[in-house]
């Protein structure tokens, strides 16, 4: 099933995989959070699990603060910081409901969490302590850091753009250009916009500059749809990850496929083989050479028999990730 450019990690989580994140400066280490209440650190080239720590409920997201510190949150409402060298942990704080998103903003040096309690909280990683709580209009489903800005996707198809240096007011309030519930938002590495996916097999490419001439460039497209017996099956697009160098992006859907897209020329660059089950999370390494793919059943069809959850590590090439022609 897997070729010479791809392998499956040993010792995968024992339940659904919620998030995969590479270390900020190397493709050697991968952080993985899971519904089995664990966060795991893998040494990717060695194909071994280096460390595991627990929450008291399913872990919904994790992030590196720096190469030696992991942050994580989930259904137990707790935000933890774990020292990956000493295996010591610190309960940093809590939300009033499950923590859905954990991200680090290097430009402002804050950790950001988003919760189903309808707030975003900022955390000073040096102390560590809470550095502010900011109300959102609905439950937070997804968020992404773009330079010193924060893009938040909530229930009710709302999108909010915040300035992390001045959280006193919302910079922009938007509505998703897609008709159905938002599943994932990820910011372009060039900081000009973001990509948003929905549960209804669609992706939107959006721009942050509100001027009419820039807004004219935004568009949306259908993807992760399969014709079966002449009936189109439409799948949620669960995961997005950007290639830091080329500003192209990968999407993963509940159809088990990973696609790589060129947003400038509006083209699909490639599609990988079908994975055993839904793609729950994706992460490019910082240098863009490696893609981590979490194939993990997301209970779209209730608790039926399903393939084992797994993490695939794929070496990707420029041919798969680089825009084909000069972008005008």
Swiss-Prot record:
The gene is BUB3. GO terms for biological process: attachment of spindle microtubules to kinetochore; cell division; meiotic cell cycle; mitotic spindle assembly checkpoint signaling; protein localization to kinetochore. It is found in: Nucleus; Chromosome, Centromere, Kinetochore. There is a cross-link at residue 216 (Glycyl lysine isopeptide (Lys-Gly) (interchain with G-Cter in ubiquitin)). The modification Phosphoserine is found at residue 211. This is Mitotic checkpoint protein BUB3. Belongs to the WD repeat BUB3 family. GO terms for molecular function: ubiquitin binding. One of its GO terms (cellular component) is cytosol. It comes from Homo sapiens (Human). WD repeats lie at residues 4-44, 47-84, 87-125, 129-164, 170-210, 217-263, 267-316. SUPFAM superfamilies: WD40 repeat-like. It comes from the Eukaryota. Keywords: Acetylation, ADP-ribosylation, Cell cycle, Cell division, Centromere, Chromosome, Chromosome partition, Isopeptide bond, Kinetochore, Meiosis, Mitosis, Nucleus, Phosphoprotein, Repeat, Ubl conjugation, WD repeat.
